[in-house]
UniProtKB/Swiss-Prot annotation:
The name this protein goes by in its record: 1,4-dihydroxy-6-naphtoate synthase
Family, per entry: Belongs to the MqnA/MqnD family. MqnD subfamily.
SUPFAM superfamilies: Periplasmic binding protein-like II (SSF53850)
Residues the record lists as binding substrate: K55, L56, S57, T107, A108
UniProt keyword list: Lyase, Menaquinone biosynthesis
Species annotation: Thermus thermophilus (strain ATCC 27634 / DSM 579 / HB8)
Amino acid sequence: MEALRLGFSPCPNDTFIFYALVHGRVESPVPLEPVLEDVETLNRWALEGRLPLTKLSYAAYAQVRDRYVALRSGGALGRGVGPLVVARGPLQALEGLRVAVPGRHTTAYFLLSLYAQGFVPVEVRYDRILPMVAQGEVEAGLIIHESRFTYPRYGLVQVVDLGAWWEERTGLPLPLGAILARRDLGEGLIRALDEAVRRSVAYALAHPEEALDYMRAHAQELSDEVIWAHVHTYVNAFSLDVGEEGERAVARLFAEAEARGLAAPSPRPLFV
């Protein structure tokens, strides 16, 4: 059987989640071929329907609901997990300022667009944002992934925690990313893949040290301390199953996107 291409990012939470599935520690209903790419690349590919199974920002999912459906397992959603805006010093407002952003299809960018208007986005790969801010190439940066743990090393300060802002505004956890299956795979296979991803998450949680070498191999020279901080922040009970509260959070995010004309309403269910 031809291998199914599975896209996910090289960030520790994704490599932790998929370690067991990729290495045969848990059974998959079909052979899988891992494709590791930056999340914004995966977001753009999803607009083309390129990968049958892929990690995706929830903000991008809102644009591809007719083609993809979210698995209940494997996602990144929670409290205290949000993107941060950082700068070299305190800022009163972002209007008119250049802000380095990790892509216009990311949930982080969507949140920043809700929070502030009039800033000038400068799109770069997420791991270039901190150096750009520190060197004065831009006035502020919108940071995601491990950057939320490393920005003090660059002498930068937090301007706003967009996750905390979302939680205060909605009372809900923040949906960041999900694992999506292309609907043409069929419901039976999609449900089997969902269960396989859930088992992979459970295996990693039960044997965390076993995944460390795989995480290190893709973690862009991060220390073990930062790798584990990343995992403990982004992998949680919502990663095993999005649950009712998670579903409400995603529905709220999509409603915000639809209200601003950033996504079309869809009658399709959000999750398999």
